[in-house]
Each structure stands twice: as structure tokens, then as C-alpha cells.
């Protein structure tokens, strides 16, 4: 509980958000050692083969923004009643005794 109170005190003192504080802590903790990222480390070679971004630094990565839809009808807002479904066949009578 004391660590939570300390975190809240630090956030209030510096006026930063929790996300920013976590990023700062992770930057201090992350190893930027080139030996760990090289292909010559055989300790985790199997995992690295399956996960190509295994040694990618998370402090410098950003999330990709979604690309806006640029399709043929992206410029118009379609309402649900604009294109009603046409019935090409008469409705069936599925009653058992009909």
C-alpha cells in the first residue's frame, strides 16, 4: 500500500500521468545492450525465430494510427433505409398444416 501512495505522491508532485510515469520507469529498466539483440545469442534463438520482434525496444515504438476509409462510398453517409433489400421471390408459407 505504501508503494501505491508513493506513486500517487510522485504523480501529484511532478504533474505527470500514470502512463507517462510507466514509460519513464520502463526506459530506466530496459536494456539497450547490442549483445542481447544480436543474432549470435544462441540462448533464445528458437524464440527469436518465431518472434522476429522479440528484441525490439518498446520505448521507441508507437502504435499505428488507423487509416481512414477511402473506399468508393466513404464520402457519403448511407442510411439503413436507402437501399432496402428486394425480394425476388414471394414469401414462402412454411406452416406445417397450411
Curated annotation (Swiss-Prot):
Task: Give the protein family.
Answer: Belongs to the SPATA45 family.
Look up the domain of life of the source.
Eukaryota
User: InterPro entries from the xrefs?
Assistant: SPATA45 (IPR038806)
Q: What is this protein called?
A: Spermatogenesis-associated protein 45
Q: Gene name?
A: SPATA45
The organism named in the record is Homo sapiens
